[in-house]
């Protein structure tokens, strides 16, 4: 086992990365090795899918499936070895199918097949018990004994960035949004990484290519969400519970939430969001359901306690999943799509009757709690509508600075930085927030500036697209570049979606971003220096010192 993709990976003066019987996330060495085999096999799939486009061979089924399978290897998504084996076996079947199609088409048009990469020749045995023996060939740090650590680090930056983009591609696909040009670019990059490249400049350029591709993917996902559910509107959400039977929906998949709301109408079941599903309340086509009762709990790292105390059924639609056996709620948990845990019921299709039956069999909440409201729904359209008023307040000197404080949450004590930072931000500043990092401070009171709330919840992690649109609009209004705006990004990272959003911001030319709580373990000192020199990336220190530096600029 070797895994170094998330923030909680082992980091000591002598060891970087999880390489023992179990990772810090709870992933076993077996699952980790199987995921490596799957990823390397997917690189082979992309070799033939990319080559196929030169021969007019496009397999839509493969295009739509491959990013989904890649998503299954993202942090805290799928811990079930049987499911990973299924993905791996399917990838091998697709690779063989594509190879046959491409070779046949190449013969017809006289196209010469280039030299095959190792990934293109990576064949899986029919006996699944033999898959683990291939793990050394597929390890994400393969070649580390002969390659410079900077090369390995950049390969991983690209791999993890592309993995984050693949997750957003799958979220968009579920909502009917696909683009052949993006599929082609995804396969091109994935196939390139399967060649084990060693040119530093080429790898750096590829990381920027991934960032720009992800910008288009986030735009696509934004369209899918707003076309399907309407544009988010500022909406108050109750973060306390109501008496009655209940279902909790966690993850990111708004499609699943809608289906659950439709199927629970009139059944006396309250539906609650959790974690990154909180922004769902801002969408008119979801908020119209009166039994969408509120948001329960906070960020992912608290779920074992919060889920254990939830007296109903729980549906995990995407990341982040933790071991449900710790809180003894595995019998009330259902996984969807790419999510998996051994022994937990997995649902395919759109029939949630098993979830409903489970919810009705539980006692539910016994009484109503006193309501506590927070506001969400400041998505792209709402921000654009508010832009003229915001500009006016800036011109009048009432708003002097904007902070975007968000990203992934986690359980390290250093993450209290983000709570303290927002609390100490000047009262003439506006704070935009997104992703689950918001739970560090979104129940605090920030007041308003002449009717403009000082805290604006933009949405899920992918809604960084909305924040970017606001920054572009403000830069146009003030006739300056984004980096000249009184705007500072203070981001927290945990997994691969955060990595690709950072690459997107870099690719768009955004500089001076503060990141934390720690640097990714796969980035060497040399690579961190490159990011500091090229993009003015800064590591967080203390809220007091960072605010002093920011406001003095």
Curated annotation (Swiss-Prot):
GO terms for cellular component: cytoplasm. Its main location: cytoplasm. Transmembrane segments: none annotated. PANTHER family: HYDROXYLAMINE REDUCTASE. GO terms for biological process: response to hydrogen peroxide. This is Hydroxylamine reductase. It is an enzyme of class 1 (oxidoreductase). It is found in: Cytoplasm. Its cofactor is [2Fe-2S] cluster; hybrid [4Fe-2O-2S] cluster. The lineage of its organism: Bacteria, Pseudomonadati, Pseudomonadota, Gammaproteobacteria, Vibrionales. Binds 1 [2Fe-2S] cluster. It catalyses: A + NH4(+) + H2O = hydroxylamine + AH2 + H(+).
């Amino acid at each position: 086992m070797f895994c170094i993709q998330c923030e909680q990976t082992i980091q000591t003066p002598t060891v970087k990365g999880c390489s023992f019987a179990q990772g810090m996330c709870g992933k076993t060495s077996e699952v980790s090795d199987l995921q490596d085999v799957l990823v390397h096999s997917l690189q082979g799939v992309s070799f033939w899918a990319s080559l196929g486009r030169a021969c007019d061979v496009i397999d839509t089924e493969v295009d739509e499936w491959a990013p989904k399978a890649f998503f299954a290897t993202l942090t805290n998504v799928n811990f079930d070895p049987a499911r990973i084996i299924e993905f791996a076996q399917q990838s091998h079947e697709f690779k063989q199918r594509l190879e046959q199609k491409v070779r046949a088409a190449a013969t017809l048009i006289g196209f010469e097949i280039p030299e095959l990469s190792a990934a293109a020749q990576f064949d899986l045995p029919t006996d699944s018990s033999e898959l683990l023996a291939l793990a050394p060939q597929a390890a994400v740090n393969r070649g580390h004994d002969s390659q410079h650590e900077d090369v390995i680090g950049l390969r991983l930056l690209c791999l993890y960035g592309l993995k984050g983009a693949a997750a957003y591609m799958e979220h968009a696909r579920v909502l009917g949004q696909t683009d052949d040009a993006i599929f082609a670019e995804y396969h091109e990059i994935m196939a390139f990484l399967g060649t084990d490249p060693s040119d530093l400049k080429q790898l750096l350029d590829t990381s920027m290519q991934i960032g720009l591709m992800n910008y288009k993917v986030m735009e696509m996902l934004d369209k899918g969400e707003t076309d399907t559910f309407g544009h988010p509107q500022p909406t108050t959400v109750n973060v306390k519970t109501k008496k009655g039977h209940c279902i909790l929906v966690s993850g990111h998949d708004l499609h699943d939430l809608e289906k659950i709301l439709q199927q629970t109408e009139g059944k006396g079941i309250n539906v609650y969001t959790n974690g990154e599903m909180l922004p769902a309340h801002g969408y008119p086509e979801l908020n119209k359901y009166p039994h969408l009762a509120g948001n329960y709990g906070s960020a992912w790292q608290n779920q074992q306690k919060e889920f254990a105390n939830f007296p109903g059924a729980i549906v995990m639609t995407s990341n982040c999943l933790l071991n449900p056996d710790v809180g003894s709620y595995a019998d009330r948990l259902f996984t969807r799509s790419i999510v998996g845990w051994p022994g937990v019921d997995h649902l395919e299709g759109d029939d949630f009757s098993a979830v409903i039956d489970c919810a009705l069999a539980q006692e539910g909440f016994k009484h109503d709690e006193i309501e506590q409201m927070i506001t969400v729904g400041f998505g792209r359209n709402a921000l654009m509508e508010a832009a003229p008023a915001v500009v006016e307040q800036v011109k009048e000197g009432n708003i002097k600075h904007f902070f975007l404080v968000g990203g992934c949450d986690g359980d390290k004590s250093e993450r209290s930085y983000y709570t303290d930072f927002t609390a100490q931000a000047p009262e003439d500043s506006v704070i935009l927030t997104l992703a689950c990092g918001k739970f560090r401070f979104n129940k605090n009171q920030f007041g308003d500036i002449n009717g403009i709330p000082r805290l604006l919840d933009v949405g899920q992690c992918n809604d960084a697209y909305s924040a970017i649109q606001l920054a572009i609009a403000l830069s146009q209004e003030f006739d300056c570049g984004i980096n000249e705006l009184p705007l500072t990004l203070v981001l927290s990272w945990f997994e691969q979606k955060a990595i690709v959003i950072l690459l997107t911001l870099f690719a768009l030319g955004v500089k001076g971003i503060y990141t934390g709580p720690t640097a990714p373990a796969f980035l060497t000192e040399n690579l961190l220096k490159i990011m500091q020199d090229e993009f003015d990336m800064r590591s967080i220190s203390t809220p007091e010192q960072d605010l002093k530096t920011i406001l003095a600029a």
